[in-house]
Amino acid sequence: VRRPLPLKTAFRRNLTLTTLTFMILVGYTSPTYAASTPRPKNENIVVHGISTKAVRHLVEVMVSSPSWDHQLARWDSKLCPLVAGAPELFKGVLLSHLYSNAQIVLHGLSKDCEIKNVIIFFSENGQQSFNEILNKYPSLIKGYNSIGLNRDDYEELSRREIEALQADRPVRWYRSTSTEPASGTIVGKDPLSGKLTTSSIDGGSRILQHTQARTTSVIVIIDITEASGATWKQLADYISFVVLAGPKLGENFNAISIMSLYNNRTFQKTAPPAMTPFDSAIIQALYESETAVQSHDEQLEITQSVISRLGSSLHLN
């Protein structure tokens, strides 16, 4: 039986935003990288009736990057969620789904954490809540945990980003990321400019870079009126994908993904009942792919990995 989200009267009123005060995380452990998935021999392979080219496009919007030369960000084991404004019962459902999905790719993840860096906020007016957060934190905590390797970590939000976050929609989100030294990278300081420098222990590579991107915080705001219609499970998996993968805000997603739940900014009755094998393959490929490359190279690797993972269980032609 599909249980729609309860009316907004089921949620606590008059919530404050004091829970959005972040503390700086300390320490970082470089993840272990999996070998790149080889390019498939058949470039015309079809997954769920979708061509390789279309799968690549899906990857680009489901694991998004500000531009092709940026790097894709992912979490390390310091992910620590806080849910505010939801009924106690759904808090448990949401956290259970989020931890279950995260533990597949984040080894060493602990539920016993103190520094909250994933704020999932249920509001009676998502637009108003975002504006309140923006007024209090104009940078949306951007760059708060950066060591200064990349000035992009500190750039102010663009007008386009702010407008997208202010638009009426069931769910809105924003990720803060930090540029970190990649595995095998030495960080130094230029004696004249004082700027941080990077160099590779083994001399470097034409493709591999000296840096990688790490997700440091995520703010998710659910408008409880606009989001109504979905089941708790659907919404929990939708939020889990948002937190773990970083899809593009405002995009319409293919119906094979739980992310199609709110296409066209409204609940879609035809959306999957839960996170799909395609969604899971995207997340696993993201966390197994090479991190020290530009986003377009990594998205290609993720595309190939998704096709490789799903090809044996699907009818491909």
What residues fall within each predicted segment?
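Short, flexible turn/loop "capping" segments at secondary-structure junctions
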Residues: 39, 71-76, 212
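Hydrophobic beta-strand segments of well-ordered beta-sheets in folded domains
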Residues: 43-45, 75-81, 218
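Long, folded non-catalytic interaction modules
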Residues: 82-102, 106-317
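Boundary at the C-terminal end of the N-terminal hydrophobic targeting segment
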Residues: 29-36
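Bacterial N-terminal signal peptides
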Residues: 18-27
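N-terminal secretion/transport leader regions
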Residues: 40-50
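N-terminal secretory signal peptides that target proteins for export/translocation
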Residues: 1-12
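Compositionally biased P/S/T/G-rich terminal and signal peptide-adjacent segments
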Residues: 50-75
